[in-house]
Amino acid sequence: MTAILLVRRQPVTPIFFNQQYPTLVDICARWQLIYDANAPFELRFESDSLTLHKRDEPKLDGILVDFVTGAVAHRRKFGGGRGQSIAKAVGLKQGVTPSVVDGTAGLGRDAFVLASLGCTVTMVERHPVVAALLEDGLRRAYQDAEIGDWMHERMQLFHGSSLEALSKLEQEVDVVYLDPMYPHRDKSALVKKEMRVFQSLVGADLDADGLLAPALALATKRVVVKRPDYAEDLDGVKPSMVIDTKKNRFDVYVKAAMK
């Protein structure tokens, strides 16, 4: 699979950025982000990485997508491989490596885990700022000597407003993976920071229940929904099976056997 970027036209989004930085100007133009001196968020380039800052909380670190170093790299090397709960949930097993659409990509961490285990993954992200961060993370990953080759083959980004838009793609999808934004009770510094930034940027996934039906229509084998352990079933629909983890669970809606 070639690593392509499919852009769906969206309403313009206000953002603050340095207008004297040509690369930032180009990125904002491509993603229809318009300069606004009073915008609550700023995009910057720091150490060759596109970063998002909440302007009224200057002490917070910038948010970026990093597939090469840090926590995701550690998980790729030491995270348990196909024995991980997410791998079991999507149906990874010997001789079976499904194609996956991640319908709520966010910072792309779960998509990266699945790609590192061999899945071809299409990330869907509807918010243009988050999509811009994902694109930049992919750019750096594609250039990396260790992971660049397989990243090109296994991960692509689709900027669209809904899963229904993906049904127009002429490709069969085994699994649709969903992780709708849900209020977190976890008070760790990282979760507090990222949730504060993301919830104020994109808002809550108030239409999350509406994702299940198009996901079931698109997937040929199963839909996997990641939920906090205290959350109700998506759209009130009971899953075929549940895989529990320490703080979350994977609700699996099976349509057909993995082969």
Curated annotation (Swiss-Prot):
**Coiled-coil zones:** none
Recorded hits in InterPro entries, A to Z, give: 16SrRNA_methylTrfase_J (IPR007536), SAM-dependent_MTases_sf (IPR029063)
Enumerate the residues binding S-adenosyl-L-methionine. R109, D110, E125, R126, S161, S162, D179
Q: Which GO terms describe its cellular component?
A: cytoplasm
* EC number, as in UniProt: 2.1.1.242
- Enumerate the subcellular locations listed in this protein's record, separating them with semicolons: Cytoplasm
Q: Which top-level group of life is the source organism from?
A: Bacteria
Judged by the first EC level, this protein's enzyme class is transferase
Pfam families membership: SAM_MT
> Has keyword Amino-acid biosynthesis?
no
The reaction(s) annotated as catalysed by this protein in its Swiss-Prot or TrEMBL entry are: guanosine(1516) in 16S rRNA + S-adenosyl-L-methionine = N(2)-methylguanosine(1516) in 16S rRNA + S-adenosyl-L-homocysteine + H(+)
Keywords from UniProt, A to Z, are:
Cytoplasm, Methyltransferase, rRNA processing, S-adenosyl-L-methionine, Transferase
GO molecular-function terms, A-Z: rRNA (guanine-N2-)-methyltransferase activity
Gene3D superfamilies from the entry? Vaccinia Virus protein VP39, YhiQ-like domain
Supply the CDD domains for this chain: AdoMet_MTases (cd02440)
Q: Which family does it belong to?
A: Belongs to the methyltransferase superfamily. RsmJ family.
**Function in brief:** Specifically methylates the guanosine in position 1516 of 16S rRNA.
Protein name (Swiss-Prot/TrEMBL)? Ribosomal RNA small subunit methyltransferase J
* Organism of this sequence: Shewanella sp. (strain W3-18-1)
